Every structure is written in structure tokens, then in C-alpha cells.
Amino acid sequence: MNFFLHKNTTILVLAPIIVVASITFGFWFKFEKNITGFFLIGETFKKSPFLDENKILIVKNEVGYDGQQFLSLAFDPLMNHEGTLESLDNPRYRAKRILLPLVSNFLSLGEYKLIPYVFVILNSIGILTIFFMFYIIQKNKQSYYLLTLAIPGIWIVLRISTAEIIANTLILTSYFFIQQKKVKASFLFLMLACLTKETMIIFTISYGLVFLIKKDFKKIFVLAFFFIPFYIWHIYLIYKFGLGRDFD
């Protein structure tokens, strides 16, 4: 079992190999070199107007999963195309998780064919980041780091292309920086996590409560300041969709 301990640097090489091998197997063999297989596109929901239905992998007898929704959003993050709105089961709710689709679109430089690839690559990088962050944070303890990759959830998320990997990566990074007393960096990654998945706001509340108990009002102010992009995005959603519940 010593092979799995942090002292064996071989695991730092094995982790990327495992992730790359998993993606390669899925792309080449399971999905027959069709990257859209990672998004679990079903038969029921309307497809993004930026997708050619003759060139995507549609899973029969499937409604369609979150990955399909994220991909539609990645093609048109501001949801300016009417077809994008029609392809989303609940645009207001889906758009609250904008960061991963937005970054995928940005890094693809407007090339729609590249967006699915970038999306999958970002989630893959997220898995490795979680592994290496855990290694850095726990490096002075005897931990079985390679077993981090044995968590089923990360591979499920990679398979269906949702935002949990990136959200948790950002939260872990925020935690790392707060431990290093780098408060501003921590708050930045915390804000990005909340733009990735809105339920991460629970960590923001936790931070705020700790600062409130300690009467550290300066940090509360700084935390609120770093969330300006978060406020702006939600103001945009109100402008576009009005006020109301997510599930109208």
C-alpha cells in the first residue's frame, strides 16, 4: 500500500495518465470519436441551433441530461438566439451556472466546433487540479492521494459534462488560499465557484458568518466587493427574464 502514499512521487505522474486514458477511451471507443457523446444528448429536448443533428451522438430513449443544457448554453452564453432559449428547459435556472459554458465559449475563440472539446478538457483539468490541490493541502499527512481519483462522482460528471468538477475545484482553491491567509485570492475563487454553480453560495454564507462572529467587518466588505461580477450577471438575468421563480 506504500505505493499510494504521498511520499511516492510516481502518483503525480499516474494521475494525468489515468485522466487522459479515460478521456481517450471514451472518445475513441465508447463514442466513436464523437465528442458530443460526453454530453448525453437525448431525444426529447430540442437541440441547440448551433448543433448539426446529423453529426451529434443522440442517446436513444434518453430525455437529455444537464450536459446537453450546458452545451447549448456554451454555444450562446448570453442567450441571444431564440433557438438557444428553446433548447433550454429553464433558461433562467440554467444560466445561473454560466462560468463553465462562458469560459468554454471564450477559449474556443468563436469556433463552435471546438466548444465541446474545450468543455471536456476543462473538466479534465478540474479533476487533476482537485487531485493536486488535495496533494498540496495534505502533503504533510499520510494520505492515499491516488484514491482521490477513485471517487465515482468525478467520472460521472466527466461523462455527462456538468459543472460540479469545476465548482468543487474552485471551492478547494478558495479554501487553499484562505488557509494561506491570501484572502482576496480566496474570495475571487469563491465568487467564480458561485458563478459555476449557484449552490456554492452556501460557502459564501459560511465565510460571512465566520467573519461576522469574529466582527471582522472589513473582510465582509471585501467579500461583498469581490462578488460584483456575480451581482452583474444576476442583474442581467433579471433584465432578460424578469423577476420570478426558476421553475415557472
Question: What residues fall within each predicted segment?
Answer:
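Extracytosolic helix-loop segments that constitute the early lumenal/periplasmic catalytic or substrate-binding loops
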Residues: 44-89
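Transmembrane-helix signature of polytopic, membrane-embedded enzymes
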Residues: 112-117, 131-153, 169
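Specific aromatic-rich, kink-prone transmembrane helix
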Residues: 133, 157, 166-185
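Membrane-interface alpha helices of multi-pass inner-membrane proteins
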Residues: 172-177, 184-211, 226
